[in-house]
């Protein structure tokens, strides 16, 4: 099993999502973030006690950006030939099997990954136990 190259701790500055202002009051206003552009908007004018706006200061550290908690970056894999791209980068990237891959191909990908010493982040997904078969 490959050991991650990253030794620095991954720190997320903010865990809560930035939600759209007044999305909690109206059904028609969805939660996905939109920048407020109104002339009287309290959020745009940054009043105290209102919804926070995303800005550059909330970004994570450049050295740990896009890293998973296990210390690897994610690379989505659809077949075993794509898995072989990670052979030389197995300490930086881990494979993640795409969501639309069948159980049969998943087993082949997981088996090939163990031969190449590549970590698979979702290797237990959609695998049946002996009792079900």
UniProtKB/Swiss-Prot annotation:
Keywords (A to Z) from UniProt: Ribonucleoprotein, Ribosomal protein
InterPro entries reported for this sequence: Ribosomal_eL32 (IPR001515), Ribosomal_eL32_CS (IPR018263), Ribosomal_eL32_sf (IPR036351)
GO cellular component: cytosolic large ribosomal subunit; plastid
Family: Belongs to the eukaryotic ribosomal protein eL32 family.
Positions in coiled-coil regions: none
Protein name, entry field: Large ribosomal subunit protein eL32y
A GO molecular-function descriptor: mRNA binding
GO biological process, one term: translation
